[in-house]
């Protein structure tokens, strides 16, 4: 994706063009050679690499080129080692630190770790053990996760609906709720 020119760069360019047009309008006869040199000065490569002095027509092109200076050049021996390291990837396993189960990809291990995290939820001691922890997400039949909160209800009404079910939800007089 190309970066847009800033308003400042655009205004400087417009000022240069306006000055050029004023100079051209004031002269009665412009030599073709002078005009060619003048137009060439605007189209020349104006962004120069400080490392190798190569010039580029856009700042983006210069940025891409400068990145090539940061990459180390591979020798023939290093290319062979890199090729061998690609073979190693197929045999590498990701191991769960909790149950020692192995997985072929880190993404699979991450999904597996979610199972351990959900079983490790610890409730603070000041919360009554009678009130179950309320899951925010539930799985529906197609294994999609859905939000189990009714956004039309207050948080208290949502909690009561979860505890007592939809069949018996006590009516709350909001005058008495702080």
Curated annotation (Swiss-Prot):
This is Zinc finger protein ZAT11. It is found in: Nucleus. Disulfide bonds: none annotated. It comes from the Eukaryota. It comes from Arabidopsis thaliana (Mouse-ear cress). GO terms for cellular component: nucleus. Probable transcription factor that may be involved in stress responses. Its main location: nucleus. A zinc finger (C2H2-type) spans 47-69, 94-116. The keyword Repeat applies. Expressed in leaves. GO terms for molecular function: DNA-binding transcription factor activity; transcription cis-regulatory region binding; zinc ion binding. Keywords: Metal-binding, Nucleus, Repeat, Transcription, Transcription regulation, Zinc, Zinc-finger. The gene is ZAT11. One of its GO terms (biological process) is regulation of DNA-templated transcription. SUPFAM superfamilies: beta-beta-alpha zinc fingers (SSF57667).
């Amino acid at each position: 994706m190309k970066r847009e020119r800033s308003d400042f760069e655009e205004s400087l360019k417009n000022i240069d063009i306006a000055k050029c047009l004023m100079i051209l309008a004031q002269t009665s006869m412009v030599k073709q050679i002078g005009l060619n040199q003048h137009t060439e000065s605007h189209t020349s490569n104006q962004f120069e690499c400080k490392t190798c002095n190569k010039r580029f027509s856009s700042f983006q092109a210069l940025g891409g080129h400068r990145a090539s200076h940061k990459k180390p050049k591979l020798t023939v021996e290093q290319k062979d080692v890199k090729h061998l390291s690609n073979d190693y990837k197929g045999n590498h396993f990701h191991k769960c630190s909790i149950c020692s189960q192995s997985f072929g990809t880190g993404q699979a291990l991450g999904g597996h770790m979610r199972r351990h995290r959900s079983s490790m939820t610890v409730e603070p001691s000041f919360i009554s053990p009678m009130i179950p922890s309320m899951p925010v997400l539930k799985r529906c039949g197609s294994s999609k996760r859905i939000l189990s909160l009714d956004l039309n209800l207050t948080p208290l009404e949502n909690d009561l609906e979860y505890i007592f079910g939809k069949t018996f939800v006590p009516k709350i007089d909001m005058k008495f709720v702080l």
